[in-house]
Regions:
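Extracellular "leader-to-stem" segments immediately downstream of a signal peptide or signal-anchor
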Residues: 2-3, 12, 18-88, 93-106, ...
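Small-residue packing motifs within transmembrane alpha-helices
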Residues: 6-8
Length: 201
């Protein structure tokens, strides 16, 4: 009986330690950084709480097959300057290059809407970014958010990277250069988020 009591005491001492270790593993990223509460947020975004809506077509940005990078970026900048709001992509296919979202700006795609990336790398502005494990000057992604607090992408629409041409060229180069990287082929990325918090996609 005494041996059984000692065994129970040993188990009682071990279990809290084991559970504490498990909880610690769950609550931290692999690099040891604590996982913040916002990272667990899984409720649908309510754009009615995000400020004014900036619908592309209200600002003469149309689904006409043309690249509208400058116009959409100007609208993002306007929304930020006016205190923030939601860039709304309505039904249709809207073409653009890289876009840099600002503090208090958000992206919403209506059902049937497509924000399609240009297949010309020159439409993605150069800037300091990270790709393939290094910080460098490289072409931006289609959607960029750096240093933001409270950025969201939501809606039932589609963000289309339009990357088939880059994909084909990359694997064509790989046939004669096995060391070819995404940077060598100058492939843009779809979404790039860094140095930000309270992000929901």
């Amino acid at each position: 009986m005494k041996r059984f009591a000692l065994l129970l005491m040993a188990v009682a001492l071990i279990l809290p330690t084991a559970f504490a270790k498990k909880k610690k593993d769950v609550d931290r990223f692999p690099d040891g950084t604590e996982i913040p509460e916002w990272f667990r947020q899984n409720e649908s975004v309510n754009i009615e709480k995000l400020g004014k809506k900036y619908v592309l077509t209200d600002y003469e940005i149309f689904a006409d097959g043309r690249i509208h990078t400058e116009e959409i970026q100007a609208l993002i900048d306007k929304a930020a300057a006016d205190g923030g709001g939601v860039i709304v992509v309505p039904r249709g296919t809207f073409m653009t290059g890289g876009l840099q979202f600002k503090q208090n700006t958000h992206l919403y795609l209506e059902e049937g809407a497509t924000l399609m990336g240009s297949d010309f790398i020159g439409d993605y502005p150069l800037g300091k970014t990270r790709i393939e494990g290094e910080t460098c000057t490289y072409f931006g992604a289609l959607i960029n958010a750096d240093g933001l607090d409270g950025f969201t992408i939501s809606g039932k629409g589609t963000i289309d990277g339009n990357g088939l041409r880059y994909h084909k060229q990359f694997w064509l180069r790989r046939k004669w250069n096995r060391q070819c990287t995404n940077k060598d082929e100058q492939r843009p990325r779809l979404v790039y988020v860094s140095n930000s918090k309270n992000v929901q996609i």
